Amino acid sequence: MNKLQREAVIRTALELLNDVGMEGLTTRRLAERLGVQQPALYWHFKNKRALLDALAEAMLTINHTHSTPRDDDDWRSFLKGNACSFRRALLAYRDGARIHAGTRPAAPQMEKADAQLRFLCDAGFSAGDATYALMAISYFTVGAVLEQQASEADAEERGEDQLTTSASTMPARLQSAMKIVYEGGPDAAFERGLALIIGGLEKMRLTTNDIEVLKNVDE
C-alpha cells in the first residue's frame, strides 16, 4: 500500500467507527469495507492498537484547530480555546474519547505540546506547573467527552430521561443541583468546569514582577 492508500484506510476506518463504534471496529470489518483481504491492512497497522493510534492522530489533525497558541492569545484564551477545540475533535467521532485515551502521541503532537509548554512558561508558569496544567485540562476534556458520549449512548439504549428516572431518589439539594446541570447541558458543564480550572491556575502563575525578580537573582 502506498501513502495515499494508507490515508484511504484511515478515512474509511473513521467512517466505519461512526457506523459501528469502537467495539465494532475490527480489522476484518475494515478489510471488508475496503474490499481487500485482512492481511493487507497489516502493511501499515500491525494490530488494532496501531490502527487506533492512527485514528486518534487523524481526529486531531482534521478537527483540532486551536492546538497551538495564536498571535492574539494570552494564556487564558489559549487554554480555553485549546480545550474547546480538543473537545470538538473528540466529539466529531463516535467513541472519540475512547479512541484517544491511552494513545501514544506522534511526533507532530509532541512538537505542538512543546510549543504549548513554551507559551505557558513565557506567560509565567514554571515548567512543572505548565505541564500539570496541560495534563489536567487534557484529562478533564477526555473525561468529560467520555462521560458525555457514554451518557448519550446509554440514554439512547434506555430510551428514558435519566433525570426524571432518578429524581425521586435524590435529596432535594442534589436534585436542584443536578437540574441545573441537566438543563445547562454538556456544553455548559464543560465550560464551567474549565473556567474553574483556569481560575485555579491563575493563583499558581508568576506575575511579571515575580519573573523580573527571579531574573535579577539569576544574574
Swiss-Prot record:
Binding site for Mg(2+): 100
Domain HTH tetR-type: 3-63
Gene Ontology terms, MF aspect: DNA-binding transcription factor activity; metal ion binding; transcription cis-regulatory region binding
Biological processes per GO annotation: negative regulation of DNA-templated transcription; response to antibiotic
Keyword Membrane: no
Keywords: Antibiotic resistance, DNA-binding, Magnesium, Metal-binding, Plasmid, Repressor, Transcription, Transcription regulation
Protein name per the record: Tetracycline repressor protein class C
Biological source species: Escherichia coli
Protein residues bound to tetracycline: 64, 82
Gene: tetR
